[in-house]
Amino acid sequence: MPLAIDEFSLTTVPIDLRFNEQPISSATAFTWERHDMHFLITNWHNVSGRDPNTDEHISKTTAAEPNMLSGLFNKKGTTLGHKHPVVIHIRQDSGEVAWLVHPTHKRKIDVVAIPLGSELVSSIRFCPINKMGSSDLLVKIGMDVFVLGYPFGPGKTGLPVWKKGSIASEPDLVPHVEKYVLVDTASRPGMSGSPVILRTYFIHVTQENEITATPGAANKFIGVYSGRLHTQDPLEAQIGMVWSATYIDEIIDGGLREHG
């Protein structure tokens, strides 16, 4: 009997960031398709090793900046869910980096797109998240969402944990007033870079306030999780930031490759 794996669980990629062979951090990424090209999406702070607000190194002990990314991708020609390790060089000795940043806000949008080469694309079974779901679902404050990531690493399967949360700020303020939506959820560092989806069952409301009924779930990708808001005490507020999904196409179309 074949395993029933949710298609959204196949969109994510557990990643390890390293400087040569020195481990720096673990995080989450996911795949995206645009103009017949494939990209890996994650946070700027993951690949740079620096805080986007202060530009300080996140690792206070080593001040290391990643130059390699190791990810577990779905492999072509294997059973669904079988993962294949791939190493991507994300920074050259010259300082040139592989990732694209937002053309206007740059690192102030904590999201990057890493173009994936043809040799990698030929061996990977891609499940780009922007080719799934229903873009017309209504998104409002108080609704439940799921953060799909790896708080404890890839585990035995390489499939993500679905961490439940709720939208804690007005989503319509993005991007006019705020650059991100707040979500109420407890998370761990390995969740940085996770896709966040809205999922409703059976009865669904569209942006035009029309009600539809289906026998299963409807889904909408709403953005990229980048961790909790900084507070003096990590227990003070379990509030995280989700950068709007609309930024991803802007990053790819802008084609701005940041110098490290």
Residue ranges and their predicted role:
Residues 42:
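Cytochrome P450 catalytic-core helices
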Residues 2-7, 32:
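Long protein-protein interaction modules used by eukaryotic assembly/scaffold proteins
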Residues 48-58:
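Compact nucleic-acid interaction/catalytic patches
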Residues 5-8, 46, 198-260:
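C-terminal subregion of chymotrypsin/trypsin-like serine protease catalytic domains
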Residues 10-17, 25-26, 33-35, 56-178, ...:
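Serine endopeptidase catalytic core focused on the charge-relay Asp
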Residues 50-51, 171, 252:
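Activation segment
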